[in-house]
Amino acid sequence: MKKILLAIMISSTTAACAQQFISSGTIEFEVRTNNHRALGDEGFWVDMFKDKIPQFSNTYYQYTFNDNKSIYKFERFDEKNKLPRGFGMSNPEDDVWYNDYSTGTFTNYRYILGDNYLLSGALMNIEWKLTPTETRDIAGFNCRKATGIIFDSVYVFAFYTDEITVSGGPMGINGLPGMILGLTIPRMFTSYIATKLQVSGVDVRAVTPPQKGKKKDLASLQKDALRVTKDWGKYGQQALWMMSL
């Protein structure tokens, strides 16, 4: 009996030592969007747009994190299904999201409605429901499922790992006990999936808030955008959600 207990203790200690906890690194996210579904089916202009853009597009973003802070920005397009520049309200090449999870604040640089803005404020407070029994392997990490609600009624489905200690994820999504490596927003017809993680040779000096752009309150910018998108049909709501993430 003593031998069995000793074996269990050794096994548990070995497993604990083997588990890694990562607080600094760079994650590549692949973002896949069904553009035709996002456009909806309201108005003659929708069919015109659908003829000019790919049904699906893949865009890659770089998420660098250190000291409980992160910066998320454009990396590259998949040239086979690249959207034309200027489609929608913003250009992904220009946008930068900086989050400080210790203070619960963000500073974002966004190109919206033809101008560059520096936005800052409090991170979204997302109510999460954890489903730890449902797991998925993403980029070599065992991730647990969680369901949250943003913008009052928009469900998001996330898979996170507690092996990466930063409580973050793509854009402003946050608040789970670990890093979000998989995210789906069905009503936005978009998914985010981590494809790789780099922990060595990462330039953590890049994790600094953007400085340029016109300072503006997000709520005020949302009002301006609402006036512009009021005739855009369902896609107008999509654009407003994307602007607010």
Protein language model annotation of sequence segments:
Residues 14-18:
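Sec/Tat signal peptide C-region and signal peptidase I cleavage site
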